[in-house]
Amino acid sequence: MSQDVIGILSDSHGDLAAFDAAYELLRAKGAQRFLFLGGRYSDLDEWILDRRERSRGGREYSGADFIQDVSRWLSVADQKPRPRALSGGFPAVTTPEENPLLVRESFLRAPERDCLQYRDPAIPRKILDMVGDTLCCAVHDKNDLERDDLVNALIFFHGRESEPKRVQIGPRFFLSPGRLAGAAEQTCALLEREDRDLRFSAWRLDGKAVLEPQVLPLERKTKVSAK
């Protein structure tokens, strides 16, 4: 059984139906955490809001809805905070209707260059995190990668590709889930960890594999450069 299962999606550009289909597909495949690589940073928030509005069936937001939301916020506030991360034990993901806060917390996302969040110094433009003992870097545009990123990380997730890609350059892997909008096929991807093995695959939204699951032959490093 996989110890970490990470769903990866990118470039939805307002197509909330595709975002929704990708989330449900990846969740059905066991994803516990999600990487949204940009291509309209706010789509995550709008998708959660859209799901909740549709769950009310057109009914207006009521006092009971408000009380329920406050109760959810308070229950989260009472919990011991834990840092967001790609790897580790996490609660089973749910739907935005059941627990929108848990769903949002299960995502890490990177902003694209033409969004306001890209210029916000409080929001990192890249995600650097460990999956098992492998340092990974996630970014919307791979041109934003810097020398230290390339020296230190072994796996790079990036958006802005018309189709899923699994490219090896030396010991490093550049992985893209493809696009949810603006491409011939709407696709997303999955990274699974079993012990020290990492397996990458990509999928159409109808569940057909575009890139079959394949273990990445990684060469682990013994030290990290910090300059």
Locate the predicted segments by residue.
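Conserved beta-sheet core of the metallophosphoesterase superfamily
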Residues: A85-L86, F90, T95-E97, L135-S201
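Metal-centered catalytic cores of metalloenzymes
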Residues: I6, G132, R147, R193, ...
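A short C-terminal boundary segment appended to hydrolase-like catalytic domains
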Residues: P164-G170, D197-K227
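Flexible, glycine-rich phosphate/dinucleotide-binding loops
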Residues: D43, A183, A209
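Active-site metal-binding loops of divalent metal-dependent hydrolases
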Residues: L9-G14, G38-S42, E105-F107, H140-N143, ...
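A signal for specific C-terminal beta-sheet/loop modules enriched in small/flexible residues
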Residues: A31, R147-E161, T187, E212-K227
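Core catalytic region of metal-dependent phosphoesterases/phosphodiesterases
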Residues: M1-G132
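Short, well-ordered secondary-structure micro-motifs
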Residues: E46-I48, R113-Q117, D149, Q168-I169, ...
